C-alpha cells in the first residue's frame, strides 16, 4: 500500500522526468507487474518504473513528452492503491502495491531506488 508520502515522492520523481519518452518494457503476470522505461530524449539516460499488482492498464505503448502523475486510488474491493496517468497520452494504470523506480538493469541513472511503504 502506498501512503501520501509515497505518492508525493513518486510525483517528485515523475516531475524530474517530465518530457521524457515512455516505452512499454514488460508485463509479468505472476505479480501483475508492469514496467515502463522513461528515456531522456537528448541525453539517452533511461530508468525503469515498475508498477506492482496492477489491475487496470490502458493507453499507448510508446509516447513522447510524457507527463506522468500519481494519485491515491481505491480498488473495487476497497484496497488502497495508486493511479498513475498521463492525460495527454491517454495512459492510465492502477495498482494496489508499490511503484519501484530503477528496475534492475533498466537504469542508467543513480537515482534508481524503490519507493515502497515509506509512510508505514
Residue ranges and their predicted role:
Residues 1-120:
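Surface-exposed, interaction-prone regions used to assemble/regulate multi-protein complexes
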